[in-house]
Amino acid sequence: MLAVAYWLHLKMLAASAFDGFFQVVWPLFFATSAFLLYRQSEDPKALVYAGLGSSVMGIWSVIATTASSLLQRERWTGTLELLVVAPTRFALVLVPITTAMATLGLYSLVATLVWGRLLFGITVPVEDPLLFVLSIVVSIFSIALIGFLLSVVVVRYRTAWALGNLLEYPGWLVCGFLVPLAFFPPWVTWIAYALPPTWGMQAIRAAAAGGSPWFDVLMCLGLGLVYGALGTVLSETVLRSARRNATLSLT
């Protein structure tokens, strides 16, 4: 059932012209800015660092901006009530949707790497392709679980989309996509290591460099499952409150 729901939503999102533009073109603006900045160092390793980080930024952007307004869109179309009263647990309805959203971020990942190769001559060496792909898959799944939690947290707010947008740029910095964590104060590092994308990004870079990404992969997956469990518990609490106070539609 989860696989069917995931595949259905993935096809719907992939067929959307808006989502396609958002996933491919929009991240290229920020990737180009990063490439131009890092090119000033004249260090090939710096460009590779920026290339990998920019490619994963798009996946985070998808979740931060679209998952936060997921339930709000269902509310606008009048289908939120139908999802809530479905016999399937509400968490099992949302997880395939956010996973499909995160998977669509592969558009951004591929487009950014190709863009960097063609326009800036950035070649990202991948020493271990299998572990590289595994790291990407685990990162996508963990980021999707963050999106699931985020969609539940902001469901009671009319401006959920704005709250999600606020998380996009801080996530780029805190998760180490473009700026090494060593440049930040210690308290920022503690926050960073509580987020799965930080470990996922480290795993991707380690696999590309030929290192061992296993610890980072396991930490990314473990934290993602923790966020998923929190989202499951919170979703039931939110639904009980909405039913009791008749506030699901926010009208």
What are the roles of these predicted feature ranges?
Residues 1-251:
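Hydrophobic transmembrane alpha-helices and immediately adjacent juxtamembrane helices
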